[in-house]
Amino acid sequence: MNIVVGTRGSNLALIQTEWVINELKKKYPEISFEIKIIKTKGDLIQNVSLDKIGDKGLFVKEIEQQLLDGKIDIAVHSMKDMPSYLANGLKFAHTPKREDPRDVLILREGYKNLDDLPHGAVIGTGSKRRKFQLLKQRPDLNIVQVRGNVETRIRKIKDENMHGIVLAASGIIRANLQDKISSYLPVDVVIPAPAQGALAIEIRSNDSAIEGIVNSLKDENTEIQILAERGFLDGVNGSCHIPMAAYCEIIQDKIHLTGLYGDSEGKKVVIKSIDGDISSPRELGLKLAKLVLKEYENYEG
C-alpha cells in the first residue's frame, strides 16, 4: 500500500508532514508513503498581511482540492490555519499530540524578555492577536508587520533592524531551532491562537481504510483542547481580520477555557474564562463565545 501525503512546501510544513509519516511508519512499517508538495494562495502572496488577502483557508484550499480529486490520500496542516468548516466530502482524522501551544520571543542579542526591551522597541509579527496582547503589556512597543517562513522571519530581525519577533513555539521546536528562543510568553500574557501547536490530518469522509490508519495517532487530551478552542473559534466566527485567541487547560476531569475577541483596531478587546466538564469541550467553547460576544456588544472600555 502506498499513501500520498499532501502538504505545503515550507520547511516547517515538510517537517510536520515527515513527523506524521514517521509516527505512522512505527505502527505500519509495511506501508510506503510519498510526499506531494502543493502551493497554496497564502504561499504565493508574501508581501501583504494575512488579514488583507483573505480568510481562514488561505493555506489549505488547493490542498483540499487535490484530496477531493483523489490525487492525495492525506493532507497535513497546522490546525490553526484550518477554517471552521471543511469542504463537503472531507473531515479531520483524530488529532495527534500537540506541541507547546505558547508564543515565543526571538530577540536581538542582549535582550531576553519583554521587560528587557527598550522604550519603543521594534517587534515584528503578522498577527493582530499577538500585536494587541503585546501592546497591552507594553503600550510603547512599535509593532511592525512581518511575513514569511520561520527562517525568513528570524533573518529579518537583523535585515530590517528589529529588536525581535514573536512566533509560535511549536514551529521553532519542530524546526529544531530552540536555541533561537529568548523567552516563552505565558498563556496568561499572550493567549495562543485556537489549536496553536496542533496538527490537522485531513482525509476524505468516505475513506475508512485511511481513517483507520491515521486514527492510530490520536491523543485524547489534545483532541479535547482542540474541540474546545475551535468551538470558541466557530462561535465567534473568527477570521484573520480580527484578534481572536483561545486556550483550553485540562484539570483532572474539568476544563478551563479562556477566550479573547476584539475589533480590528484593538480598541475593543474582551477576555473571558469559564470552566466546564471534560465530556463536552465543543459546547463549552460555543458557550464562551456567546458570553464574549455579549460582553463585546456592550463594551464600554
From Swiss-Prot:
GO terms for biological process: protoporphyrinogen IX biosynthetic process. GO terms for cellular component: cytoplasm. It comes from the Bacteria. Binds 1 dipyrromethane group covalently. It is an enzyme of class 2 (transferase). One of its GO terms (molecular function) is hydroxymethylbilane synthase activity. It holds the Pfam family Porphobil_deamC. The keyword Transferase applies. It catalyses: 4 porphobilinogen + H2O = hydroxymethylbilane + 4 NH4(+). Its EC number is 2.5.1.61. Its cofactor is dipyrromethane. InterPro entries: HemC, Porphobilin_deaminase_cofac_BS, Porphobilin_deaminase_N, Porphobilinogen_deaminase_C, Porphobilinogen_deaminase_C_sf. Keywords: Porphyrin biosynthesis, Transferase. The modification S-(dipyrrolylmethanemethyl)cysteine is found at residue 240. Pathway: Porphyrin-containing compound metabolism; protoporphyrin-IX biosynthesis; coproporphyrinogen-III from 5-aminolevulinate: step 2/4. Belongs to the HMBS family. HAMAP family: Porphobil_deam. NCBIfam families: hemC (TIGR00212). Tetrapolymerization of the monopyrrole PBG into the hydroxymethylbilane pre-uroporphyrinogen in several discrete steps. The porphobilinogen subunits are added to the dipyrromethane group. Monomer. This is Porphobilinogen deaminase.
